[in-house]
From Swiss-Prot:
Its main location: membrane. NDH-1 shuttles electrons from NADH, via FMN and iron-sulfur (Fe-S) centers, to quinones in the respiratory chain. The immediate electron acceptor for the enzyme in this species is believed to be ubiquinone. Couples the redox reaction to proton translocation (for every two electrons transferred, four hydrogen ions are translocated across the cytoplasmic membrane), and thus conserves the redox energy in a proton gradient. It is a peripheral membrane protein. It is an enzyme of class 7 (translocase). This is NADH-quinone oxidoreductase subunit I. Its EC number is 7.1.1.-. The lineage of its organism: Bacteria, Pseudomonadati, Pseudomonadota, Betaproteobacteria, Burkholderiales. It is found in: Cell inner membrane. Pfam families: Fer4_7.
């Protein structure tokens, strides 16, 4: 005959109550762990910046406000190939062109709707003459939607104003192109 096995569960003795259990029951150990973590970071140097007064350095590859560039002789670079318009996933670019007397094409209308633009940089990558670029300008605003609709003249003005910065950023990024 076999002996019966006991399936009884052993219950721990509840009368044995230590100081550690007492403190953890009041969650004081968690409180001290939190205070230790706070004290660890309280006296380190701060990494938060006060944004408008302090600015972080931007990468030369930062994609900000668009600009149209000109050649050194003052002629605009855009040859109206419309590759940027075709590749734009947000359909934010509108181009109209006409043929000049010398047989070359130039834009009569080059508009970018920054309300639609997703700043992907495809327009900049597709441009064969390096005409459309995204600058490192990140602080611009509009009080209405129409203020963020940039025409050809506005884009050329941005390019003319920031050409030294654009050229420096292009030179810094040249080995990666």
């Amino acid at each position: 005959m076999s002996t019966p096995t006991s399936n009884a569960i052993e219950i721990p003795n509840e009368s044995a109550f230590s100081l550690k259990d007492f403190l953890s029951s009041f969650m004081l150990s968690e409180l001290f762990k939190g205070l230790a973590l706070t004290g660890k970071y309280a006296f380190r140097s701060k990494i938060t910046l006060e944004y408008p007064e302090e600015k972080t350095p931007l990468s030369p590859r930062f994609r900000g406000l668009h600009a149209l560039r000109r050649y050194e002789n003052g002629e605009e670079r855009c040859i109206a190939c419309k590759l940027c318009e075709a590749i734009c996933p947000a359909m934010a670019i509108t181009i109209e062109s006409e043929v000049r007397a010398d047989g070359s094409r130039r834009t009569t209308r080059y508009d970018i709707d920054l309300n639609k633009c997703i700043f992907c940089g495809f327009c900049e990558e597709s441009c064969p003459v390096d005409s459309i670029v995204e600058t490192s300008i990140l602080e611009y605003h509009g009080e209405s939607r129409s203020d963020l609709y940039f025409t050809k003249d506005m884009l050329l003005a941005v390019g003319d104003r920031y050409e030294p910065q654009i050229a420096a950023a292009r030179a810094a990024d040249a080995k990666y192109r």
